[in-house]
């Protein structure tokens, strides 16, 4: 397995915060009020933005399971198995997302981002760094992933930014449209769209892939990207950015991830074509292709054995899997019109030394 975003969106009845429910910042439930940005009065229970003991310009007090020094775990990893969709809070070796050495410079000050799959893994790390750089953040995940999303909420609000959680099923086109509208309604606008949520389930042969499985993978990984982008177009202004999570598998393939690899390749082609179409509008479209990343996606993959998980990332030149905090800065670069104003239509590879030509 290579690219690790998040498991796919699923339908759940009685979602506590459906996309079409208007929960304004003024009426949010106690303890869930959006926090204020730099220069505004924030929640009194949150740390002052851009302060962190021992780390200048790093603000949130790390969770107990987050390391305070730069030390990426290496194989062998714990042999464990998670039930779908896979919760980060249940992993014995927690993915690292805090990026304690990352120094923010206000690259995204005043911007608003919508991040799918922002409850954990790469999506959580991206949401946290976006907030650290000054952006307000809305994330999308399934109701089953809400326990992880609450940690993302805590981390984003501790950075002094506003946060919106949207729960539902990204395979539903209407829900995708509602996600965009709710982000704009509650945060005022949309500057950065990150299509990151994904579903994968390894199969050792083509014959094992059912039609239902094939459609679920495509609906979650590429169809949702199309629906979200189409809905976002009326809100995106010159200087806005669209970023999608592809994968090493989308570039080199995988014998056990035929459907997943096909969607990740489609993401690359769609993004490159989108970049050409939107260039004259001043809107940039790019994608990131991570290699193996330590997230809940793999222990929740029914086709990934605990023994294989223990060796995860060992075949990369760097001999290990990445941590989400190592991947997220690429998303900051691609979102910042100060850093990447002349960058569109690229695939930014983060694959631990593996090259594709």
Model-derived regions: residue spans:
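A glycine/serine/threonine-rich, flexible loop-to-helix segment
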Residues: 256-257, 280, 292-316, 357
